[in-house]
Amino acid sequence: MNEDPQKKDEPFFKDVEFKASYGEANQIPSQGIPQIAFAGRSNAGKSSLLNAILERKSLAKVSSTPGKTKLLNFFFVNRSIYLVDLPGFGYSANSHKDHEAMMDLLMDYLNLAKDLKCLFLVCDSQRELPEEELELIGTCFERNIKPVLVRTKIDKLNQSDLSKLRKKMKNIHELYPMLETVLVSNKSGKGLPELRKIVDSLITTVGTLVEGNTKKIEGIS
């Protein structure tokens, strides 16, 4: 799939800025501005994916230590929607207590974020999809949140592995027929146009918001 024509080196989303970080879901003000969140295990490549979609090298901080980020990070895109980089969960170096805390934060966010319209569930294509992530997909459907399963690092699979992955995806789609799945490689760019289209379609639906008529999300110290 080709993206709309654009000037060379000009990003698809021209107006992007970091807005705020939150340590608790109940600190996030409700503004009526739609949100797309990125969730997944700590080593799935969420922050790298967000940077790749927005074509900014270091907008979302990518830590060399998976599981280090424990905040909800908000990025304002084209003055219309927020992309939210959620803390990762499930990395083996984290304690069980840390894992539970991150899952609690994620569920609190899902329960309280009235403006959340879409969840990108980011999963390394080299790994199995854990049961709790399958349940997360079901939770999204129950709450009228569009889930998109994003299988990252697809360039690291050989043809045999890719065939096995497609079979597993078919089984998941039998469970959730309406689930959209996108195979992604940040290295080759595969799948990124599809994800940008999902973000852009929400922007088009919302329309550009006038800054003077919206409250800015303020950061916390």
UniProtKB/Swiss-Prot annotation:
Pfam families: MMR_HSR1. One of its GO terms (cellular component) is cytosol. SUPFAM superfamilies: P-loop containing nucleoside triphosphate hydrolases. GTP binds at residues 40-47, 67-71, 85-88, 152-155, 184-186. Mg(2+) binds at S47, T69. Keywords: Cell cycle, Cell division, GTP-binding, Magnesium, Metal-binding, Nucleotide-binding, Septation. The keyword Transmembrane does not apply. Its cofactor is Mg(2+). The keyword rRNA-binding does not apply. GO terms for molecular function: GTP binding; metal ion binding. Necessary for normal cell division and for the maintenance of normal septation. PANTHER family: ENGB-TYPE G DOMAIN-CONTAINING PROTEIN, MSS1/TRME-RELATED GTP-BINDING PROTEIN. This is Probable GTP-binding protein EngB. It comes from Leptospira borgpetersenii serovar Hardjo-bovis (strain JB197). The lineage of its organism: Bacteria, Pseudomonadati, Spirochaetota, Spirochaetia, Leptospirales. The gene is engB.
